[in-house]
Amino acid sequence: MAGSVLENIQSVLQKTWVREFLAEFLSTYVLMVFGLGSVAHMVLGERLGSYLGVNLGFGFGVTMGIHVAGGISGAHMNAAVTFTNCALGRMAWKKFPIYVLGQFLGSFLAAATTYLIFYGAINHYAGGELLVTGPKSTANIFATYLPEHMTLWRGFVDEVFVTGMLQLCIFAITDKLNSPALQGTEPLMIGILVCVLGVSLGMNTGYAINPSRDLPPRFFTFIAGWGKKVFSAGNNWWWVPVVAPLLGAYLGGIVYLGLIHAGIPPQGS
């Protein structure tokens, strides 16, 4: 009986769509634990964290996530990247919900894990209050929020541009016909790319550049006690890190494929 159950489980786990779902789930979980943990250090730890540390946390979190699942699903860990690959015909649309569901669940669980790990520090920092805005806010550990110097639509354009740069450079790093990263170094190079985007272009919006990075942790804070303000803050900013990266990644992909990839002669020609 036990053997039969194990065989059934093994049979299910060998299905391609199941393996891809689990790969996106686990790789996104790894990315987000490192990323959110680094933000928690910056927000809660006074001198124990820094903005550079946040960029390193997310950058090398991406690297580790690709090592975890790159050979199975490609380790997108980003609904905007998945959307772009589907929209540009590089993967089937039927994979889109499988990938995104895995990413969202992994990100949500990572937010819950971060909350449990830093529960004491979060409560101590704000005197037991769960604040979305203000100098003692802690919701920004989990999701991005629009700063005072930015308007909603400037933030939208910012997210479109930065995500476009992300997707353009990912295509360049992985383009075997151009000048790709050395074999085996792609995870490191993409991680460095994320870090560079953060230190050069991340100030305005916190460079969400990923619906899977922003929306699930935001929803976690909503149900964990921060309340409805996580969606209403910043003139209802919440939808921008969901929609703008989809548009930005698509445009960045088109720019690279149209201006660079299409002009590369086939190998052997």
Curated annotation (Swiss-Prot):
UniProt activity-regulation remark: Glycerol transport is regulated by pH, with the porin being permeable to glycerol at pH 7.4 but not at pH 5.5. Water permeability, however, is not influenced by pH. Not inhibited by mercury ions.
- Primary location: membrane
Motif NPA 2 positions after renumbering to this chain? 210-212
Provide the GO biological process annotations: glycerol transmembrane transport; renal water absorption; response to xenobiotic stimulus; spermatogenesis; urea transport; water transport
Topological domain ranges for the Extracellular compartment: 39-51, 117-151, 202-205, 220-237
**Modifications made to the protein after synthesis:** Phosphorylation by PKA could prevent the interaction with PLIN1.
Where, by residue number, is the motif NPA 1? 78-80
Q: Where in the cell is it found?
A: Cell membrane; Cytoplasmic vesicle membrane; Lipid droplet
State which tissues express it: Detected in heart, kidney and testis.
Residues the UniProt record annotates as site (Important for permeability to glycerol)? Y119
Cytoplasmic-side segments: 1-20, 70-73, 88-95, 173-184, 260-269
Q: Which Gene3D superfamilies match?
A: Glycerol uptake facilitator protein
**Residues that bear Phosphoserine:** S4
Transmembrane stretches, by residue range? 21-38, 52-69, 96-116, 152-172, 185-201, 238-259
Which segments occupy the membrane without traversing it? Answer: 74-87, 206-219
Q: How does it sit in the membrane?
A: Multi-pass membrane protein
Q: What are the residue positions of the site described as Selectivity filter?
A: F58, Y207, R213
Q: What InterPro entries does the annotation carry?
A: Aquaporin-like, MIP, MIP/Aquaporin
Q: Which GO terms describe its molecular function?
A: glycerol channel activity; urea channel activity; urea transmembrane transporter activity; water channel activity
Substrates-to-products reaction catalysed: glycerol(in) = glycerol(out); H2O(in) = H2O(out); urea(in) = urea(out)
Q: What top-level branch of life does the organism fall under?
A: Eukaryota
Quaternary structure? Homotetramer; each monomer provides an independent glycerol/water pore. Two homotetramers on opposing membranes can dimerize, forming a cell-cell junction. Interacts with PLIN1.
Q: Report the sequence similarity comment from the record.
A: Belongs to the MIP/aquaporin (TC 1.A.8) family.
**Recorded domain comment:** Aquaporins contain two tandem repeats each containing three membrane-spanning domains and a pore-forming loop with the signature motif Asn-Pro/Ala-Ala/Ser (NPA).
Entry protein name? Aquaporin-7
Q: Which organism is it from?
A: Rattus norvegicus
